[in-house]
Amino acid sequence: MARGSVILLGWLLLVVTLSATLGLGMPAKEKRGWTLNSAGYLLGPHAIDNHRSFSDKHGLTGKRELQLEVEERRPGSVDVPLPESNIVRTIMEFLSFLHLKEAGALDSLPGIPLATSSEDLEKS
């Protein structure tokens, strides 16, 4: 019985040493990059986009609330004018001003600059 125990112990030691040298043991758990929690902990709350603390949340929490906020700020919304529409409106007003100026409709209004350029003024 003692001889069988010695052989079993020797066999187990041999298997353990071979598995350790060949890399057959249990693989170590790999870390796969950053998570939101680790980045938030290391970088601070100001480094994470759309960070909201627990005290800032009113009413619903989570994805539903964020989706409602995104829908309210949608660029095609009627409530919020687009900056591009302001630019387009300004360009359209300027073009209509130039058209009226060419047609002579603005000649009688005071404060409108003349159609002559600075070169024409220097020549005369």
Curated annotation (Swiss-Prot):
Q: Where are the transmembrane segments?
A: none
User: Which Pfam families has this protein been placed in?
Assistant: Galanin (PF01296), GMAP (PF06540)
For biological process, the GO terms are: nervous system development; neuropeptide signaling pathway; parental behavior; positive regulation of cortisol secretion; positive regulation of timing of catagen; positive regulation of transcription by RNA polymerase II; protein kinase A signaling
- Where, per the database record, does this protein carry Threonine amide? 61
> Which keywords does this Swiss-Prot/TrEMBL entry list?
Amidation, Cleavage on pair of basic residues, Hormone, Neuropeptide, Phosphoprotein, Secreted, Signal
Report the leader peptide range.
1-19
Q: Which residues carry this modification: Phosphoserine?
A: 117-118
Question: Which positions are cleaved off as the propeptide during maturation?
Answer: 20-30
The main location class comes to secreted
Keyword Nucleotide-binding recorded:
no
Q: What is this protein called?
A: Galanin peptides
Provide the species name: Mus musculus (Mouse)
Gene that specifies this protein: Gal
